[in-house]
Amino acid sequence: MTGPAGRAARTTSGRRRATRAVRPVEPVPPLAPEEPAPGIDREALTRTIAMVNDKGGVGKTSLVANLAGQFAAAGYRCLLVDLNRQANLADDLGFRDGPADDRGAGLLVSVVAGTPLRPVEGVRPGLDVVAGGARLVDLVPLMVSRVQEQGREAFLALAEVLAPVAGDYDLVFVDCPPETTILTDLALAAARWVLMPTKSDGGGLVGMRLVGERFELARELNPDLGLLGAVLFATGSRSRVVHAEVREAVEEAFGGHSPLFTTSIRHAERTAQDARRLGRLAHELEQEVAAQPAWWASLREGGGSARRLSPTAASVAGDYRDLGVELLTLLRATEESTTESARLDARPEQEATP
């Protein structure tokens, strides 16, 4: 992402923001401001986005990896936190079984001990990761025990260890697992925003409704939490009917709000297979596709049987670029609106009176 949409403008707090026109769809706003939980720097978490849907296979990990990868390539500092025990993020970014892959041990230790997360730096330039994996199996019974002892306050454990490092980044994405609600509740208690991928089939929409129920419950603990929007993933149709149906489902799940992103990510099975097999992101595949010799040249040189990368990688990468621009535009609009509201609230009563 280059130009105005790919670079961020500094806010008064020193964080960076995108510079493009305002998107017409409004996100679900946070609740009325309340006192933040003691010891948690909510300001540091204002660019923390939880990728949530209780249904698996709807694109959560793909969106996290590709959006963060493109933002990092454009000069943003990004952090990814993987709460998934399957750790598919390690496959998408190509660090499975490498030095960065601790299988969730570091994340587990931080949450148990209450010490700041220690991201693995430089998985891509500007892109750091807190890995997930099999060790997170041990986190579930631990959280069950803590909730029994402390109540829902126990779900602030991730916020407490993420906030000390989140301020070092322009964007933080939390990849949430399907169905393991306790780990997702940790993310909802830490995040400022929810971004929700879904497919247009029944399973994805049911998963979205389940998230809607827990979203409202999470806001009792984290009133800063808002819904940034829903994204149609792996869709073969861009018809208005499909978008209208999904928009209606979002509205039903989130109490009358229907923020559906204009950009959707197209279905491209070969590109998805190439990406996970090679540990490449869509924009990286796009570059490799452009560099590979023409099919007839490979055939002439005796390489006709070698597997070629799918040319649809360029189209998929374009979808992610468009979604990234739309996401940054919406973030900037909401941040400016919040800043203006705070400024008006801070004015003396006599100045605020016309």
Model-flagged regions — what are they?
Residues 2-354:
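P-loop NTP-binding core
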